Amino acid sequence: MDETKKGFMQNIGDLSFKKIDETNYEFSIKVEEKFLNTGKIAHGGFIATIADTGMGNAAHIAGGNKRAVTINLDIKFISAGKLNDILTGRVEILKKTKTLVFINCKILNSKGIVATASGTWKILI
């Protein structure tokens, strides 16, 4: 467990995140055994968590490094992430207002799209 992270995020492991430009961000993580469901594929809750985390980080930065909380999150599971896959999230800020950020995300592995996500974050002022 990563003791430098707080709370629930200690369970996620090494999720890397980078800003590409003002509206595009990217994150990645390796699928470990602890992230698998009983069918031996990446658990849907894990996919939702990394989408929420990656998109939330983008909202935080887009909002001027202010705290941002998820208002809604919609996930569509398209294919399976498997053990040792590197999942990459491509995040796009669609619109930002003073207090809201609207975001889309595609999560991919080496074979294509694993999931898509869209959501809205509230910037806490």
Task: Please provide the spans of the model-predicted regions.
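Terminal targeting signals and extreme-terminal segments of soluble enzymes
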Residues: M1-I125
